[in-house]
Amino acid sequence: MSSNSYDPARNEYFEQFQGSHQGIARFFSVNPNSCGNPAHFKEYLLCNAMSDSLTGMGVTHVLAQHDDEGNPTAILGYVTLKASSLLYRTESGYSGKPALEISELAVNQQFEHQGIGRLLLDYALFCCREIQKSAGVMYLLVYAEPQAVEFYSHVLNFEKMGDLYEIPNEVWNANCVPMLLKFDMLASSEPVYPSEDDDEEDA
């Protein structure tokens, strides 16, 4: 098997991005044909993931390969989550619904076409369910790259937002497409993702 093949039995699991990932983050790259700003995703890992975590702006979770000693050797993909709000217009102004936002999601181009994107989405849903046990979360939100709209629509039935709704916007994703998923749509769906405790049989 190629070293660039996804294999959950080969010490590949999710963990929060931390200092031990900084060295391998420089080898992360996104296929330029998959989005409009591929350099952004590497830059985010190298320059912003740690600071966002420390300041409470967002938490980045990486799917990483590890050696036999548990040291990360490659980042297959990552997803960054942050608290957000689904804003909607009313006669008196704006109101909001509690939400979790996928502010970053990227797959290393060395590991494309192996289901990594779906694993990242499933992990985001798992986190959403865990948060919902102690806090209100009604929607999962994302600003999708135009090239990724079909992926979000078909994989988990995300919908484009109408003119009635908004997500707090950022400069870099001004050309992206705001999409939403009502959380209870997936209440009966059980995400499957690799963890450090998974054994070969479970994988």
Residue ranges and their predicted role:
Residues 1-114, 119-141, 145, 149-203:
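Non-catalytic substrate-recognition and accessory regions of acyl/acetyltransferase enzymes
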